[in-house]
Amino acid sequence: MKVEIDSFSGAKIYPGRGTLFVRGDSKVFRFHSSKSASLFHQRKNPRRIAWTVLYRRHHKKGITEEVAKKRSRKTVKAQRAVVGASLELIKERRSLKPEIRKAKRDEKAKADKEKKKADKAARKADKAKSAATQASKISKQQAKGAFQKVAATSR
């Protein structure tokens, strides 16, 4: 025996009972009574109508035994080494005091600044040297030379 479920109220529909409504998009709705069909056609929300199964579920009615809450597994952070830094190095850096950390950071920034400055000076000197060796710039057209007329060789 196939027992259907009411599309609106969620009630059971036994064989030989209820009506079918087929919408324009060919979706089939089954209704237990004209009452639920009427409310469906009025576009009422079954969660707001007190006697429907959806309302009872939504408002937690009729649940006798309290179901124990599902326990979610807590994620535990695990320290792992990263490429280029071992676990000991990471732990050591984490345990540094903020003042020491700031001093190290400033020192590194200063060293980077000096390196950048030296690099820029070297690049500038290199550019000046290359500019001195290249006396006059020649365009690509000049480098190719004047157009050479091909002599006829047929005679």
UniProtKB/Swiss-Prot annotation:
* Ranges where the record places region Disordered: 97-155
Bias (Basic and acidic residues) ranges? 97-129
Establish whether keyword Ribonucleoprotein is in the entry: yes
This entry carries the following GO cellular component terms, namely: cytosolic large ribosomal subunit
Mind telling me which InterPro entries this protein's record contains?
L24e/L24_sf, Ribosomal_eL24, Ribosomal_eL24-rel_N, Ribosomal_eL24_CS
Q: What domain of life is recorded for the organism?
A: Eukaryota
Give start-end positions of Polar residues composition bias. 133-142
Q: Where is the signal peptide?
A: none
Keyword entries, A-Z: Ribonucleoprotein, Ribosomal protein
Q: Name one GO molecular function term.
A: structural constituent of ribosome
Provide a GO biological process annotation.
cytoplasmic translation
State the similarity comment.
Belongs to the eukaryotic ribosomal protein eL24 family.
Q: What is this protein called?
A: Large ribosomal subunit protein eL24
This chain's source organism reads Eremothecium gossypii (strain ATCC 10895 / CBS 109.51 / FGSC 9923 / NRRL Y-1056) (Yeast)
What gene is this protein translated from? RPL24
